[in-house]
């Protein structure tokens, strides 16, 4: 059995920054309305780059810009490609992401090691319309996470069969799981695109972990300024202080040591 070689944290960050730099180049070339978001925005403002105990890179952009990004991404790739844009499930959410094709990850939860297909990545959050009422958003958000929960159940039901006589059953189980997973991911993505960005006054990304109380505003994508993230010039909302205070409160104050937690995965070379 091939032994996996874990990737040091510094190398993971370098890989992510290589992906990020390429994404920024594409977005600037095609004049896409992207911003760095969530912990990445917080890291840029408070630390000038990564939050010391984390290595996330999150980008968000309106749906129409994301569709353009998706269309031109492969044309901007080197040959052979170093990165690829993927949609569908990543861990336990339906977030599009860009991955380094030469790496993989192992997720460690409750003492179990679970291998996932994705690699070192950068998340891309498409932003859509939030609906026309608070009820629209609440109902659509609940439906999205209902579908995501079904995909989690599918992952949870999977058990490999060590007995060779049962491997045919395993093959069919895998096929059925794949079909069910595809169904629920598609339904989740349909929820995300239910309301048009331009037709709605309020906007939202259903894949956010912050719930329906997250306050996203069109001005964040229309009025942007440059900011450095680990030496890479990228776009942030001019009103970044307002956005960060909405999400984190007094974001300049560091959290207690026990709450400074990063990911629960271990990246490795394929």
For each feature predicted by the language model, list its residue ranges.
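Short, His- and charge-rich active-site/binding loops that engage polyanionic ligands
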Residues: 142
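Helical (often loop-to-helix) elements that flank the catalytic cores of nucleotide-handling enzymes
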Residues: 70
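A short secondary-structure junction signal
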Residues: 133-139
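Conserved catalytic core of two-metal-ion nucleotidyltransferases
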Residues: 4-28, 73-132, 151-249, 254-270
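Mobile amphipathic helical/loop "lid" adjacent to a hydrophobic cofactor/ligand pocket
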Residues: 147-148
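Active-site nucleotide-donor binding segment shared across nucleotidyl transfer reactions
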Residues: 24-57, 61, 66-67, 219, ...
